[in-house]
Amino acid sequence: MQRLRGFTLVEIVLAVFILLLLLGLAVPSLTGVLADKQLKRSLDGFNNLVRRAQERSVAERRPYLIVWSKKKVVARPEVFAEDEEIKATAEFALDRGEVLKLSLPAALTNKHPAEWIFWPSGTCEPAIVQFDGRSGSWAANYAPLTARAQVTNYAPR
């Protein structure tokens, strides 16, 4: 009896089982990488909004506000000129299930409007911003002199 070269059924089943095991281990780490990427995108998007508000307040020599609403956060001048169209200059949209919370530690009252001001000198009110969404959560302290973020909490899901 001559033996044919090839794989037996047991060897094929064993190879498929090992492949499925490796795939099962890779999928959770892949979802973690995707969640981290999405969380980083939200942090970068908000930091871009902050940078644009600061740059415009200095360039136009007038205060700018970052204003919170339910589904978005916008940057706009504090006061519009008479001939100026009333619209936001930059926007950070929030997806369903995402929450962006503003805390102003130097505010005179506990209940303050959800507005963060940038003055024409380039300084801003010190702020703590917290984000929570499906991809994870982050928190950042923004320095009053530079308006740059120091990330204090970053946890992808």
Question: Model-predicted segments: where are they?
Answer:
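N-terminal helix-rich module
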Residues: 2, 25-48, 55, 59, ...
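N-terminal single-pass transmembrane signal-anchor helix
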Residues: 1-30
